[in-house]
Amino acid sequence: MLIAKLLLVVIVSYLLGSIPFGYLVSHRGSKIDIRSYGSGRTGATNVLRTMGRKAALLVAALDVVKGVSAVAFAGLVIGTEALTFGTNGMAILFAQVLAGLAAVAGHIWPVFLKFRGGRGVATFFGGMIALCPVAAIFGGEVLIIGAGLSGFASLGSITGVVGAYALLIPLTFISGFPTEYIVYAVLGSLLITIMHRDNIKRLLAGKERKLNEKSR
């Protein structure tokens, strides 16, 4: 029964993550396909460059909600059922980590857009908000400062997710926070960094676009 619930959590969380808010907002607001502009991604950064700040903030908020909703859904589905090799708390956290990662995967590879979406940053932070708000807040601050000082959204995103992971190291091994949090942060930050590999190449080559550059 628990395996069936975990499977349900993963499928629903993936579908939640697959909701292409960047595509929907741009198509409804300006009748355009955001994938035909700029980076071709559906995330808030490309929406910012294409449609402006208000649309980008809306998309970012909705993408965050996807992560929060997936983690919350996992908690509701698992309820008080326990894993055979652990406690009830472990069962819930394990399911929530799976849910958060599935939502991030859905955002990156959305079934509704032929598996072509964003890079998963906002949805990752949504999951982190639901799991460990203090790490999410710290990582978000690092993201904003990094992007603001450098002018590169990609650099801010990478440093932000890594910052959340870095804070969880002492929180886990010194303060006793659940290890599931750091598992989510490690896997999520690794996936997001991989999704930014082209940006990293452009950063090293000095060819990465600034945050305020408009898409064409």
Curated annotation (Swiss-Prot):
Catalysis: reaction(s): an acyl phosphate + sn-glycerol 3-phosphate = a 1-acyl-sn-glycero-3-phosphate + phosphate
What is the species of this protein?
Dehalococcoides mccartyi (strain ATCC BAA-2266 / KCTC 15142 / 195) (Dehalococcoides ethenogenes (strain 195))
InterPro entries attached here? G3P_acylTferase_PlsY
Name the record gives this protein: Glycerol-3-phosphate acyltransferase 3
Q: How does it sit in the membrane?
A: Multi-pass membrane protein
What are the protein's GO molecular function terms?
acyl-phosphate glycerol-3-phosphate acyltransferase activity
Entry's HAMAP family? PlsY
Q: Give GO terms for biological process.
A: phospholipid biosynthetic process
Q: What class of enzyme is it?
A: transferase
Q: Quaternary arrangement and interactors, per the entry? A: Probably interacts with PlsX.
Instruction: Report the GO terms under cellular component.
Output: plasma membrane
Q: Family per UniProt?
A: Belongs to the PlsY family.
Task: Relate the protein's function as given in its record.
Answer: Catalyzes the transfer of an acyl group from acyl-phosphate (acyl-PO(4)) to glycerol-3-phosphate (G3P) to form lysophosphatidic acid (LPA). This enzyme utilizes acyl-phosphate as fatty acyl donor, but not acyl-CoA or acyl-ACP.
- EC number annotated for this UniProt entry: 2.3.1.275
Q: In which pathway does it act?
A: Lipid metabolism; phospholipid metabolism
Cellular localisation: Cell membrane
Which residue ranges run through the membrane?
A: 6-26, 58-78, 92-112, 125-145, 158-178
- Keyword set, alphabetical order: Cell membrane, Lipid biosynthesis, Lipid metabolism, Membrane, Phospholipid biosynthesis, Phospholipid metabolism, Transferase, Transmembrane, Transmembrane helix
